[in-house]
Amino acid sequence: MTEHTTSYYAASANAYEPFPTLSESISCDVCVVGGGYTGLSSTLHLAEMGYDVVLLEGARIGFGASGRNGGQLVNSYSRDIDVIEKNYGPDAAKVLGSMMFEGGEIIRERIQRYQIQCDYRPGGLFVALNHKQLETLEEQKANWERYGNTQLELLDASAIRREVDSERYTGALLDRSGGHIHPLNLAIGEADAIRLNGGRVYEQSPVTAIQHTSPAVVSTQHGQVTARYVIVAGNAYLGDKVEPELAKRSMPCGTQVVTTAPLPEEVVRTLIPNNYCVEDCNYLLDYYRLTADNRLLYGGGVVYGARDPDDVERLVMPKLLKTFPQLAGVKIDYRWTGNFLLTLSRMPQFGRLDKNIYYMQGYSGHGVTSTHLAGRLISELLRGDAERFDAFANLPHYPFPGGRSLRIPFTAMGAAYYSLRDRLGV
């Protein structure tokens, strides 16, 4: 059996009744492969609409990125909307821009409707490390307001100093429609909501093959599902055996996270007084927030190719202490790594592998909100309205340069270039 990685989230997860392992042959309307946010959102949307849905998870619900991430509800996509407009044209940007803030709205609605206990707190900060980044945030504010986000505020150096007890930042953009959560508890709550709506969820049921027939047949180690439709939602943890075509268009990447021991109340009150989540504007960014039990959760850096580094704490602690030198000597209780799926365009990849087999993947670090949007869009498609799904599906999906052998060093070289620009402030 494959259990959750040792993390703060796993240690503080809400108790739930485990889901069974698939050990028979069953049939349904829709079979969803993957029990992360993409699969959970898709299954819940469809179950609410009355579909007979089966979700197959190879390990535990939220085992992958959905249960290991920074817990930040970051609006929009990994590519800024002005870049989307430049790359794909104003018509595509208009449609994609109209959906930028929908994923966060879906999450908040789910939390309220199903009373999911996941420590939701509103508000997120994008912090600038130099004047060039602050200018970019000013442009971001204007672009987001153009698409309907009215909950934005620019902060100057003195204002951000009141929000974050660090001397690193020249300013920030506060998005009050952002926020943070306990991501694994959100996943568990959504799985329970699926059960409540009549959906069937199976854990410890890794998919071994998908037959592209009509109906399709999805095989696991001990059972199989015959379904009218299949949704492939494994992302960085799908591997390259089940649907190898998807692996050619994307690359798993690892990010590292540490969580401190609980901090004294007086430290918490000064560190991030309004309990916002924070991410900086570097290409290889740092992100952090406080937890419900007064720990600092801090992540940063990327390992291309999804290798697990030997010493997560050694990689992350210099970043944490550069931001908060006053925490020198703080005890680290948890350290872990998790993989997200990167695309060359930094845009999500949606599409069809066959007339009845669909996929959604590659959120490139912006998956918490975008995955929830994805679930709504696939439910619209199966209901007969493919327009919004196809707004993503029509975007070109480029392979990484260098093929399987050279894509990692080529991508790392590019990241090093942009990191140097960040350090130089250009």
Predicted ranges, named:
Residues 142-143, 168-228:
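Helical element adjacent to the flavin cofactor pocket in flavoenzyme catalytic cores
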Residues 48-68:
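Glycine-rich FAD pyrophosphate-binding loop
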Residues 105, 113-121, 207-209, 223-355:
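Active-site substrate-recognition segment that forms the wall
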Residues 28-55:
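N-terminal Rossmann-like FAD-binding beta1-loop-alpha1 element of flavoenzymes
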Residues 68-98:
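Glycine-rich active-site loop/strand segments that organize a redox cofactor
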